[in-house]
Regions:
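Catalytic cores and adjacent flexible loops of soluble metabolic enzymes
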Residues: 1-259
Length: 259
């Protein structure tokens, strides 16, 4: 079993117990880098953090690009640095929110990535991942050929295509989460956070305030000291941004979690 372990603040102290326990039970421990962009985060920082995770007992490293911010050449450089720094496999987990994942994953593969995360095409793109079938086709006949059969994958695709229509029809999948939004490059909103925020605004009858909330998120994040936006910090920052917009005044209502 692969146990993917991450901390929203990239603080190794918060991972000690989880890594120790997973190792004790014989699991494959995948230590995650919560990837983000800020004045204090760069590839050297992430490489040093990955080395710390390896020393703590991680069996592989995952670049957890939850907001799809990883650009192709930055990905290439980061994977190269990680491969030079650690002796364990490197996985790329990049969401498609900003439309960069396919390009970034391809460059990451060229840089030596050992594993990449994808999703079957009916459940891909948007806040999900790049399509599995597309990557399999792109790598056929190369040194990176996956060996997967596209005809067999098409059987799996057909199954999930029906589920996709079902979930769209009953509202479990929002069409807004299926498209590419380049604004993510400015607002740094990960997939899960975007879906949660849409629900909050819908429940409050304020769906028209989405653009205002997206613009508020980087301001709230800066106020909080540039935390990577991944569970739980994404929900904490996102909820506070929603309140700031809905209340008509910044920090008129402050959540207990944000305090």
């Amino acid at each position: 079993d692969v146990i993917r372990i991450f901390d929203a603040l990239n603080d190794p102290r918060n991972l000690q117990t989880a890594i120790k326990s997973a190792n004790k039970e014989g699991a494959h421990v995948q230590g995650c880098i919560s990837y983000t962009l800020s004045p204090v985060h760069n590839n050297e920082y992430f490489a040093a953090y990955a080395k710390t995770l390896e020393e703590m007992g991680a069996n592989s490293i995952c670049i957890k690009d939850m907001a799809g911010l990883l650009t192709p050449y930055t990905c290439y450089d980061l994977v190269r640095k990680l491969k030079e720094t650690v002796s364990i496999p490197v996985d790329i987990h990049s969401h498609y929110t900003a439309g960069l994942a396919s390009m970034s994953i391809l460059k990451g593969i060229e840089a030596g990535a050992d594993i990449v995360d994808t999703a079957m095409s009916p459940l891909s793109l948007g806040t999900s991942h790049m399509p599995t079938e597309s990557l399999v086709a792109a790598l056929q006949g190369t040194d990176y050929d996956t060996g997967l059969d596209l005809k067999q994958l098409n059987v799996v695709r057909a199954y999930f295509a029906k589920l996709r229509e079902k979930y769209i029809a009953n509202g479990q999948i929002s069409p807004k989460s299926l498209g590419v939004d380049a604004n993510t490059l400015l607002y740094q909103v990960p997939g899960g956070m975007f879906s949660n925020m849409l629900k909050q605004l819908k429940d409050a009858g304020k769906e028209d305030k989405l653009d205002e909330v997206l613009a508020e998120i980087p301001r709230v994040r800066e106020d909080a000291g540039y935390p990577p936006l991944v569970t739980p910090t994404s929900q904490i920052v996102g909820t506070q941004a929603v309140f700031n917009v809905i209340m008509g005044e910044r920090y008129k209502m402050v959540t207990k979690e944000f305090k």
